[in-house]
Amino acid sequence: SPVSGSMSSQLGAVGDLGRLGGGAKGTANFPEGMSFNPNIKNHLSNFDGLTQKSGISGTHNLDAFNQAATTNGVKVLSETPTSVAGITTVRYQIPAYDRAGNIVGFKDKIFPKTVYDPKIFTDQGILDLGQQAAAGGYKDALSKGLSQYDSVAGGITFRVYLDKFTGTVTNFHPK
């Protein structure tokens, strides 16, 4: 659910999201009325479930993804570095099960997942950059009635998801 109240209380509710880049660089200039789903940080860095339709949810942190893949019997097909050091696109398949619940192979569908290496980007660093990217394209996306848009911060392209009715940034992740 969206966070309500003043901008400072919105940002405080999700862990001082107003501070970008960590400290000395200052405070973000977020557009009027902009709010963030408080679960974004958890989604970026932790396992958020696995479905047959969507694959692994959350786990954009490489270590968390690898742990979720191992735990859930996922088959990693490839890891392709992007143009940004520390950002990688992983392609994977999820297990297929028989009626008894036994793994009998893998689903044909190949799922992509963009992950960040926590040795290069901290969870907070990715969160800060994602919020900066979200703020950058926010007004334009809202005026066009978009539910998702791409925006760049720190050289990283983020896919940003909006609730176009409330204006809340519901999610974002490196693309």
Region spans (language model):
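Phenylalanine-focused residue identity feature
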Residues: F30, F36, F47, F65, ...
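Long, charged/polar, surface-exposed segments that mediate recognition or autoinhibition
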Residues: P81-K139
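Active-site or metal-binding loop neighborhoods of secreted/extracellular toxin and effector enzymes
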Residues: A134-K175
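Generic structural signal for short, flexible, solvent-exposed coil/loop and linker residues
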Residues: S6, N29, G33, P81, ...
